[in-house]
UniProtKB/Swiss-Prot annotation:
InterPro entries: Ribosom_uL1_bac-type, Ribosomal_uL1, Ribosomal_uL1-like, Ribosomal_uL1/biogenesis, Ribosomal_uL1_3-a/b-sand, Ribosomal_uL1_CS. Coiled coil: none annotated. CDD domains: Ribosomal_L1. This is Large ribosomal subunit protein uL1. Part of the 50S ribosomal subunit. GO terms for cellular component: large ribosomal subunit.
Length: 232
C-alpha cells in the first residue's frame, strides 16, 4: 500500500469516496482538505464513454474558461510581417519565424506554454513535430492554434483558454483554477469545460458519455462530483 504524507492522510479521512458531491460541496471540501501551503491548482478528471483507440472517438479541443486558470501562460507565435506585428500588439511573449524554429531545434528552447502559428508557417513549424508533439505544444487547427486570426488566438490564451485531449484510458485531465478561487468561480469554470466536452461528443460514441467527474487540488485527494448536478 502506498505511503501518504501525514497531511494527505488526514485529508483522505474527510473525503467519503462513496459519495457523489454536488459541485459546490465538492469545491468547498477540496479547499478544506488541500494539504499544501502554496496556492494549489484545481484539476478535474472527466471519464468519458469513448474508446480512444478509434480515430472517430477522439475528443480534443479548447475552451476559454470564464475565470481563467489563475496561471499566466507564455505564448509563442510563429508569424511574419503584419501577422507578427498583430501578435506582438495582442500580447504574445515571443514572435518569430525561422529564428524561433532554429532556437528550438538547436538550443532545445521550450520557454513557452502555448505555440500559435499562421497556416502558411506550418511547413516550417512541422519540422518541430518530434520536439513539440510529445509535449503537447504543436500548433493544431482543432485547438484554434493554427489560424490567421492571431490577435484573437493570443488574447484567448491570455484570458484563460485551455486545451483538452482524451488520454488512452478515456479520461480528460484539465486545470480549472486555483484553490484561492471562490467556489462560484470554480463551479462556473467546471460547467464551462463540461459543456464544451458535451459539444465535442463524437458521433461514434455509444452509451453513457459522461461516466464520471472528480476534482482535486495538486496535492490533495480526488473528490467525486455528481455529473447530473454539473449539467443541470
Amino acid at each position: 500500500m502506498p505511503k501518504h504524507g501525514k497531511k494527505l492522510t488526514e485529508a483522505l479521512k474527510q473525503v467519503d469516496r462513496s459519495v457523489l458531491y454536488d459541485p459546490a460541496e465538492a469545491f468547498e471540501l477540496l479547499k478544506k482538505v488541500a494539504p499544501a501551503k502554496f496556492d494549489e491548482t484545481v484539476e478535474v478528471a472527466v471519464r468519458l464513454g469513448v474508446d480512444p483507440r478509434h480515430a472517430d472517438q477522439q475528443v480534443r479541443g479548447a475552451v476559454v474558461l470564464p475565470h481563467g486558470t489563475g496561471k499566466t501562460r507564455t505564448v509563442l507565435v510563429f508569424a511574419k510581417g503584419d501577422k507578427a506585428r498583430e501578435a506582438e500588439e495582442a500580447g504574445a511573449d515571443f514572435v518569430g519565424a525561422e529564428d524561433m524554429v532554429a532556437r528550438i531545434q538547436q538550443e532545445g528552447w521550450l520557454g513557452f506554454d502555448v505555440a500559435i502559428a499562421t497556416p502558411d508557417m506550418m511547413g516550417m513549424v512541422g519540422k518541430l513535430g518530434r520536439i513539440l508533439g510529445p509535449r503537447g505544444l504543436m500548433p493544431n487547427p482543432k485547438t484554434g492554434t493554427v489560424t490567421f486570426d492571431i490577435a484573437r488566438a493570443v488574447k484567448e490564451v491570455k484570458a484563460g483558454k485551455i486545451e483538452y485531449r482524451v488520454d488512452k484510458a478515456g479520461i480528460i485531465h484539465a486545470p480549472i483554477g486555483k484553490v484561492s478561487f471562490s467556489t462560484e468561480k470554480l463551479v462556473e469554470n467546471l460547467r464551462t469545460l463540461i459543456e464544451a466536452l458535451i459539444r465535442a461528443k463524437p458521433a461514434a460514441a455509444k452509451g453513457q458519455y459522461l461516466k464520471g467527474i472528480s476534482v482535486s487540488s495538486t496535492m490533495g485527494p480526488g473528490i467525486k462530483v455528481n455529473t447530473q448536478k454539473v449539467t443541470a
